[in-house]
Amino acid sequence: MARYAVEKSTHTGGAFSDLVFVDDRTPAASVYDVPVLQLADLEPGDFYCLAVGDGKTRSDLAARCDAAGLRPYSLLAPTFIAGPGVDIADGAVFCDHSIVTTSARIGRHFQCNIYSYVAHDCVIGDFVTFAPKVACNGNVHVEDFAYIGTGALLKQGRSDAPLRIGKGAIVGMGAVVTKDVPAGAVVIGNPARTR
């Protein structure tokens, strides 16, 4: 994700004068020819975008950045498509060819990898991660910190009974989810079952 953020940084419309990585644990002077700084080197009001796949780690880092007075920045790839009525919270990352169709709510620091989509009337929580090629059909509610693996398929819910993926749940690669997934559960297979 970090490399992707660097490669797509040229599509920010010239909004930024400097692009840096922030990592208090990395002794390297640069990564991908981009300077590496420590959090203390940044100024209140600077923007940040978290390039970390794990939602809990992203949450911890966001809390540190927010406490330092930094502002979350959403990174939208040039091929990202958002339909009408889409509400995207701060800090989201949408990679190339990702789509949110219509009337969906996207939580803080959501990461949507390449070729993933979120269909109509979905609610995606904070710090959720979609790996590449996730198919999230309409009327699905994904709670905070859930991780949806590559190629997973989330069945269409109903407006009166959305399909629910519980807080912190993990949906394995290629899983076909046809029923609600409880909070903290790990599901795999077709149809998806608790591991």
Regions found by a protein language model. Give the residues of each.
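A structural motif detector for beta-strand N-caps
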Residues: 74, 80, 86, 90-98, ...
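Intrinsically disordered, low-complexity Ser/Thr- and acidic-rich flexible linkers and loops
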Residues: 156-164
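Solenoidal tandem-repeat scaffolds enriched in leucines and small polar residues
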Residues: 178-180
